[in-house]
């Protein structure tokens, strides 16, 4: 039996964060499990109106993001106790029907850091991100810690561009970091890979497979991938059988439940030492089994040179 699901996105569905939600919901729709409708480019000022309209239309599950409107979104959930809400949100679950998620892909970020720490020759690594908020900060810290675990002499340059999508600004920030001496970059935002290609240095990708999807061939060594399928499928199943409750879905976006992985090395397969690939493979198994825990640090990371 199909359930009706609405996706409400603040960005275009091509934007990588919302794209991961849309892909997972679209896959469920193609399997015939849900009837899926969505709205994109919904501003925070208009979000509650759109949310209420969907709730009044017979939707059974809403998937979206409440980062700028946490309190208001919870009020809507209170007004529609029969509807399930799965929202990107930095706070705790609410009531009986408001579950929260975020992208906890810090584990593959740590693994990328190990590779980066072995590949830098200058011992200077650059990172360009959107905003210094938890979901970005934790990824940067994990990447830094992974690099430092194999090379404690590395210094970092950190820049936030104040936008989720401004490729020219991200490229400019990356160019400035390369001028400052970095020879490896973490491309948290689109635009960084372009700078790395022009400057002849390598990069590591974020959320989506930037080697294949952002013209990163020969530049992007690997990417920390975020998969929302496990979380979305769990929410759909719970909604269908009437057991949906207010939960934290963080674990569903981590490696053990298939919510995060490391992308293939592609043409870098032969450029990464076998010993490093072996170390990453061994540590991946330990993370999956719970024998190794990657620290979560949501504090703003700072440049160290």
Can you name each region flagged by the protein language model?
Residues 1-305:
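A residue-level marker of the well-folded mature domains of exported/periplasmic proteins
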């Amino acid at each position: 039996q199909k359930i009706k699901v609405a996706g409400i996105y603040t960005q275009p569905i091509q934007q990588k964060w919302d794209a991961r939600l849309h892909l997972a919901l679209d896959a469920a729709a193609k399997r015939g499990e849900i009837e899926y409708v969505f709205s994109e480019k919904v501003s925070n000022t208009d979000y509650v109106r759109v949310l209420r309209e969907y709730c009044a239309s017979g939707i059974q599950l809403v998937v979206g993001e409440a980062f700028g409107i946490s309190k208001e979104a919870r009020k809507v959930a209170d007004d529609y106790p029969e509807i399930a809400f799965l929202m990107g949100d930095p706070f705790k679950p609410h009531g009986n029907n408001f579950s929260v998620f975020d992208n906890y892909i810090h584990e593959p970020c740590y693994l990328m850091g190990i590779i980066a720490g072995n590949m830098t020759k200058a011992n200077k690594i650059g990172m360009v991100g959107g905003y210094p908020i938890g979901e970005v900060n934790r990824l940067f810290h994990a990447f830094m810690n992974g690099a430092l675990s194999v090379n404690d002499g590395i210094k970092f340059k950190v820049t936030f561009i104040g936008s989720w999508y401004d490729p020219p600004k991200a490229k400019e920030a990356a160019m400035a970091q390369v001028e400052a001496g970095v020879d490896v970059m973490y491309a948290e935002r689109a635009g960084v890979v372009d700078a790395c290609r022009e400057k002849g240095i390598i990069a590591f990708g974020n959320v989506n497979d930037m080697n294949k999807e952002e013209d990163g061939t020969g530049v992007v060594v690997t990417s920390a991938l975020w998969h929302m399928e496990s979380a979305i499928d769990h929410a759909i199943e719970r909604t269908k059988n009437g057991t949906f409750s207010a939960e934290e879905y963080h674990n569903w976006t981590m490696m053990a439940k298939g919510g995060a992985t490391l992308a293939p090395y592609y043409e870098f397969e032969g450029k990464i030492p076998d010993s490093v690939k072996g170390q990453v493979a061994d540590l991946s198994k330990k993370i999956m089994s719970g024998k190794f825990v990657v620290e979560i640090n949501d504090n703003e990371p700072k440049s160290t040179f």
